[in-house]
UniProtKB/Swiss-Prot annotation:
GO terms for molecular function: 16S rRNA (adenine(1518)-N(6)/adenine(1519)-N(6))-dimethyltransferase activity; RNA binding. The lineage of its organism: Bacteria, Bacillati, Actinomycetota, Actinomycetes, Mycobacteriales. S-adenosyl-L-methionine binds at residues 40, 42, 67, 88, 118, 137. It comes from Mycobacterium avium (strain 104). The gene is rsmA. This is Ribosomal RNA small subunit methyltransferase A. Its EC number is 2.1.1.182.
Length: 318
């Protein structure tokens, strides 16, 4: 079994799960990973250390872990001194997790809360304390919806560090105009800055997936450059969906129905300093926000518009 040493401020060492123990636990539970739930469990201690180190969490953090599975990442997060709320949709795994933690370090169990829930329905009033960070090996099938839901539902979250399918990682971190740039790229930047932090080999998981994973970190803007209320966010996201739903069209043509006419669409775009001949796939989150707010200035929205400062690109190095 692998182990990880705590910082000098605490002498406790928590044993991490290795491949042998993960298989033993699965056999004990008569558990077979379900592809429909994206159940691939990380068993490599170095990978777990890397994820936790990238997250930067400490004993002052309340970490929300999505899909803890058999507990590999959970143990490492507890070893950093953090409080962890683990959200697990599988009832068998949710029931077993506290016992696994107790077997590895009984004194840490008091800092663990397990919720047998679908993360997409999780609400802030279900948690005793607001989470400050998300650290997770996200199931491939819900990665983007889960990220957007958590960032919107929990404004207290300052950082998000997740392993996702490599293709999803590329899309999240893509820049305007790139072939991978799309709806997830824009929407996640409504909340913060995004950076890819490297690749993760399929061989560190059980069962071994067919694709590589990517490590991604999102840092929420310390002060949001624009309003963050749900109504404003929905209006911005509506524009994003319109633009990428017709990504081969010019912005002028894509926004005709939204603006009411081609001329009005062009006028709104020009008011936002956007060339109507551009395509939606070249617009940044700043452009979409500015388009909505300038439209409000023209009477095209029920919100008074103000020009946001730029959100900037990139994020702190991983």
């Amino acid at each position: 079994m692998a182990s990880v040493q705590r910082k000098s401020w605490c002498a406790l060492t928590i044993r991490l799960l290795g491949r042998t123990e993960i298989r033993r636990l699965a056999k004990e539970l008569e558990f077979r990973p379900r592809k429909s739930l994206g159940q691939n469990f990380v068993h490599d201690a170095n990978t777990v250390r890397r994820v936790v180190s990238t997250s930067g969490v400490s004993r002052s953090d309340h970490v929300l872990e999505v899909g803890p599975g058999l507990g590999s990442l959970t143990l490492a997060l507890l070893d950093r001194g953090a409080h962890v709320t683990a959200v697990e949709i599988d009832p068998v795994l949710a029931e077993r997790l506290p016992h696994t933690v107790a077997e590895h370090s009984h004194s840490e169990i008091q800092r663990l809360t397990v919720l047998n829930r679908d993360v997409l329905t999780l609400r802030r009033d279900e948690l005793a304390e607001p989470p400050t960070a998300v650290v997770a090996n996200l199931p491939y099938n819900v990665a983007v919806p889960a990220l957007l839901h958590l960032l919107a539902e929990f404004p207290s979250i300052r950082t998000v560090t997740v392993m996702v399918q490599a293709e999803v990682a590329e899309r999240l971190a893509a820049e305007p105009g790139g072939k991978e740039y799309g709806v997830p790229s824009v929407k996640v930047r409504f909340f913060g800055r995004v950076r890819r932090c490297g690749m993760v080999s399929p061989t560190v998981f059980w069962p071994i997936p067919r694709v590589y994973s990517g490590l991604v970190r999102i840092d929420r803007y310390p002060t949001s450059p624009w309003p963050t209320d749900p109504a404003f966010r929905r209006q911005v996201f509506q524009l994003v969906d319109i633009a990428f739903g017709q990504r081969r069209k010019t912005c002028r043509n894509a926004f005709v129905d939204w603006a009411g006419s081609g001329n009005e669409s062009a006028d709104r775009l020009l008011a936002a300093s956007i060339d109507p001949a551009r395509r939606g796939e070249t617009l940044s989150i700043d452009d979409f926000v500015r388009l909505l707010q300038r439209s409000a200035d023209r009477g095209g929205s029920d919100r008074e518009g103000t020009s946001p400062p730029t959100a900037g690109q990139g994020a702190p190095a991983c």
